[in-house]
Amino acid sequence: MSFETSKTFPAESRYTSNVNAGAYRAYELESNPRAASKTLRMLEAAASEFYAATADTPELLREAYRLRHQVYCVERGFEVSDSGLECDEYDDHAPHVVVRRRYDDEVVGTVRLVLPQAAKPGFGLPIHSLCASDLGHRVALRSTGEVSRFAVSKERRGLSSEASQLLRLALVQGLVRMSAEHGITHWCAVMERSLLRLLRSSAINFEPVGPMVEHHGMRQPSVCNVSSVLQQMRVEQRIIWDFVTLGGTLWRDHLTTATHERRGFKPAYAA
């Protein structure tokens, strides 16, 4: 599967039922095989409803901005725009991922990765306009991207908890892909604690880099090392790691697909 060709991940990246018995035998070695099997079934079932794509056309970007307006302006009380779109100056240097519903292609989730701009103060990352942090002393800003506008609308979310989790994981998969493509080694963010907790449940752990700040609610400036996060995820949440990295193919300094297959688990994506 490749963003370079189709710019989407429909059939070839979806979790489908082509997982053989060897997958389950491999996961019997996990510390909690029952939970592992439940996670696998959840991903298989929920991924039949959604797919992720890069927002690489004006039309898809407008859909992302429209969803952001629904989430941040209508639902969370940001200033409402007459255009019905929520966008800002950071979008000019931020690739986006959207998650779409398969049966009608409606955009139900989006996230952007604000890329560093060496010629701008603070490398052009929004975190520096919102708070004082020691981010620049912790990581190399030239390879740090800011995770921002992580949005799934309540209005469009008449979803099971499993589907909601898949939406988040599909967005994280997009972040991993974009980070690999743009040489990003660290993510920073200014997030609500509730979102940080949800990410932590999938072994995505951010560390604070400053005190809580008020920005349309209290938020925590945070940072993480992408490689470290994925290494921890591979140990603690192997099935989720396989989904988020496409069996290790999206982040090459981890376990390779070939090694993964020798354990008896093949990435569960239709070719």
Residues of each region from the PLM?
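Accessory, usually C-terminal, subdomains that scaffold auxiliary metal cofactors
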Residues: 210-262
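Acyltransferase donor/substrate-recognition loop-hinge adjacent to the catalytic core
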Residues: 33-40, 134-145, 230-233
